[in-house]
Regions:
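Membrane-embedded, hydrophobic transmembrane alpha-helices
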Residues: 1-126, 534-548
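Transmembrane catalytic cores of multi-pass membrane glycosyltransferases
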Residues: 29-34, 354-446, 453, 460, ...
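Extracytoplasmic
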Residues: 45, 533-753
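Hydrophobic, aromatic-rich transmembrane alpha-helices
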Residues: 298-307, 345, 349, 423-451, ...
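Membrane-interface alpha helices of multi-pass inner-membrane proteins
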Residues: 319-335
């Protein structure tokens, strides 16, 4: 394809660095070369090539970075829609043909347009320095994510017991459910529909179907890295487009992956003092980063659209098709994406109307298209409801350290006076990574704020939604973190301007700024070194107060000294930004220091060795039993389990290891109704059915009730009883209810159907 903007030679080095880091992580984490080759081949053939081909067919030839940033999520949408269609029609065998059909059809369209001017954007020249900074920041960000994620997800082992983060077995079970059944239902509540953000699990199931790579290897090792990589690439592209500088894109990667709200406690497993951590959600929620790949692509296209003067030419319509497809992908990937886009675009339209007295037509089209697609997917994918959602403003701030401490003040009058300030401090702590935004308020730079209006509206939209509602498990924070992604670009723009201003003052100012940054790093590390994870919240807050006073003194002294000494004044915003960025940059290193320490000293990075008397995990014996079910039963098999708890006290009923590692459906597995989208206390047929199943299951395993067993086998198709002998066992009479087909020291399987 003549005229195609290929990757410039100067970009090969930065791209090679990131690729080398990804491959090295895969190899170190135990992924075989064959699995890596199959996975990479799949991603290129089934995602990148179809998406890039359709993008070029609709919009003309784009630059290589834009092609990847937009073509990848577009390819994911195509992949998911075709996979769903072939599964729904019982023709899964046709799925491998889809890339050939799409690429050939699009190639024909592109060939027919040969010689026409491309409608896509030109990337022009990019600073080599910006590309290297972006590559280095993204590489370090990948390492951070892996150090947080990989120790929690050892591959299933026949050598040692494992305890997974509570959501991960559920995710594995959902992938297996998609792979084996259509339409997919809840693997832990057999046959019951589960309205959920399924698309990332569709994708992993599709990879398993085509490549044969095991589901745990795909989910725990392979699939998350390209997603994080794509977010970094998209931040660079969107930041460069909106900020009109590659440095804005590079610094957006720095803000997103390397900055966070300061945590002094070196306790990655504990609750952070400012509660919300974007970096945590990148690995703990598989749907969140997957959804962000659609959000950032849409942000780019919407930013492009609102700058356009037309909305209904043939080129416009082709772009609307791309936006519509991405909105479909976004809505099924993460429920927070379209609401934030819609609210943010609505705020943008209001701002433009108020400031310019004009109605932005393209913004209205975005709103109309988004509302239609959101309404359709809300009904189809999510069943028209969001269980556990209530109107409760600023609910998540109550979990920040300042609010916790203020809430414990014994004097009611003093508590009421202090609490509003505690909430403000809690919000400020959450937003520390966005300190760079403040620099745009400096007089000479205020004029640039209008360039970032859309990003600021998306950022504000996420905050607005998150602070109006409350969801189970504080899931409203995903709205906030989705908005954060647009805010990263604005913060990066402020940091770029600050650095340019420092350099404009002179070499001595640049040197002083670097030394001040290093000095603050040393101060904060020193405070962290003497701060125990067991420190009470009050003591922790006092340390933050002490750092704040040192900060205020530092800013005051530097600004006054500059004025009295007749030096060029750096200004309060420039001086004040240095400690804030230093503090934000230390968040992840401090949190990961225990893991890094184990790695450097040669100790095992994975410390999840559960004691069955305290924590219930996946033991080698249980894994063997679950694999027996996977190998000796059909994919449609339903079985019942004796244990539902992840703790020996029987207070947390979210054990979902059985469906995950047998890849079979279970009569009722988790005793936590939230896992099935059921809110106990609100009378519904779903709640009645769930509680009825719990009673039947307990009757079988606790009392060997033959009547209950008859209902299980005849009405619900249960064919096996799985007795977990490590975690509680069952009534001895249960072993007489059928024929024992498998038994070891960890589990017994009784055939009853």
């Amino acid at each position: 394809m003549r005229g195609t903007p290929l990757m410039p030679r100067r970009a090969l080095g930065p791209a090679g660095l990131v690729a080398a880091v990804v491959v090295l992580i895969w190899v170190i984490s135990g992924v075989g070369a064959g699995d890596i080759a199959k996975f990479v081949g799949y991603e290129i053939a089934f995602v990148l090539l179809p998406g890039a081909s359709l993008l070029w067919a609709l919009r003309g030839r784009e630059g290589w970075l834009v092609t990847v940033a937009l073509g990848w999520p577009l390819g994911q949408t195509l992949e998911i829609l075709v996979f769903s269609a072939t599964a729904a029609t019982g023709s899964r065998g046709l799925f491998p043909v889809y890339p050939i059909v799409v690429v050939l059809a699009c190639a024909l369209r592109i060939w027919k347009r040969h010689g026409h001017d491309p409608s896509g954007s030109s990337e022009g020249q990019m600073s080599a320095g910006a590309m290297w900074v972006a590559a280095a920041a993204l590489s370090l960000g990948l390492v951070y994510v892996c150090l947080a994620f990989l120790p929690t997800v050892p591959l299933p082992s026949l050598a040692r017991p494992i305890q997974y983060y509570v959501d991960f077995p559920n995710f594995i079970g959902l992938i297996a459910e998609v792979r084996n059944h259509w339409p997919p239902t809840s693997p832990g509540l057999s046959g019951v529909p589960l309205h959920y953000q399924w698309f990332v699990f569709y994708q992993m199931a599709a990879i398993n179907q085509v490549t044969g790579v095991s589901i745990p290897v795909i989910a725990f090792r392979l699939d998350f890295l390209p997603t994080i990589l794509m977010i970094g690439c998209q931040l660079f592209v969107v930041g460069r487009f909106i900020g009109r500088s590659a440095w804005v894109g590079a610094l957006a990667i720095v803000v997103a992956f390397l900055l966070g709200p300061l945590d002094l406690t070196t306790d990655a497993a504990g609750a952070p003092p400012f509660f919300d951590l974007f970096s945590f959600h990148l690995w703990a929620s598989w749907t969140f980063p997957f959804g962000l790949t659609f959000f950032l692509a849409l942000l780019y296209l919407i930013a492009e659209r609102v700058q356009a003067t037309t909305w209904r030419t043939s080129a416009d319509i082709r772009t609307w098709v791309v936006i519509g497809l991405l909105m479909i992908g976004a809505s099924g990937s993460k429920a927070t994406i379209l609401p934030v886009l819609l609210v943010g675009t609505g705020l943008y339209a209001v701002v433009v109307f108020v400031t310019k007295r004009t109605v932005p037509a393209n913004a209205l089209v975005v709103l109309g298209l988004g509302i239609v697609i959101f309404g359709a997917t809300f009904a189809i994918v999510y069943g028209g409801g969001v269980p556990g959602t209530v109107i409760q403003p600023i609910a998540s701030y109550q979990y920040t350290a300042p609010v916790k401490v203020a809430s414990k003040i014994s004097s009611g009058l003093l508590r009421k006076a202090v609490l509003p300030f505690a909430y403000i401090v809690g919000l400020a702590g959450m937003l520390l990574p966005f300190a760079g935004m403040l620099y745009l308020l400096r007089g000479p730079h205020r004029g640039q704020l209008s360039r970032y209006t859309l990003c600021l509206c998306m950022f504000g939209g996420g905050l607005l939604i998150a602070n109006l509602i409350h969801q189970v498990g504080s899931s409203e924070l995903y709205f906030q973190d989705t908005g954060y992604t647009a805010g990263f670009i604005v913060a990066a723009a402020g940091l770029r301007l600050a650095w340019m201003d420092v350099r404009s003052i002179g070499a001595s100012a640049t040197k002083a700024g670097v030394l001040a940054f290093v000095g603050w790093v040393v101060v904060i590390l020193a405070v962290s070194a003497v701060t125990s994870p067991a420190l009470a919240q009050g003591g922790l807050v006092l340390r933050y107060v002490a750092i704040t006073f040192i900060y205020l003194a530092f800013v005051t002294v530097v600004v006054r000294y500059s004025r009295t000494a007749g030096l060029p004044s750096p200004g309060v915003l420039m001086v004040g930004l240095i400690p804030l960025v230093a503090a934000a940059a230390l968040t992840t290193p401090i949190q990961l220091s225990p893991v890094i320490g184990r790695f450097l000293t040669g100790q095992p990075m994975t410390v999840t060795q559960p004691d069955p008397q305290k924590v219930r995990g996946l033991t080698p014996g249980l894994l063997v039993a679950l694999q027996w079910l996977q190998d000796h039963t059909s994919a449609d098999t339903v079985f019942a389990v004796s244990n539902h708890w992840i703790d020996a006290a029987g207070t947390d009923g979210r054990n979902q290891n059985y469906s995950a590692f047998s890849e079979r459906q279970i009569f009722v597995e988790s005793y936590n109704p939230d896992d099935y989208g059921i809110t106990v206390g609100i009378p519904t047929l779903a709640e009645v059915n769930f509680l009825y199943r719990v009673r039947l299951n307990d009757a079988v395993f606790d009392h060997a009730d033959t009547g209950a067993l008859t209902i299980l086998t005849r009405q619900y198709g249960v064919r096996f009883l799985f007795i977990d002998r490590v975690h509680g066992g069952a009534n001895p009479a249960v072993f007489q209810l059928g024929s024992i087909v498998f038994s070891n020291n960890a589990a017994t399987i009784v055939a009853v159907g």
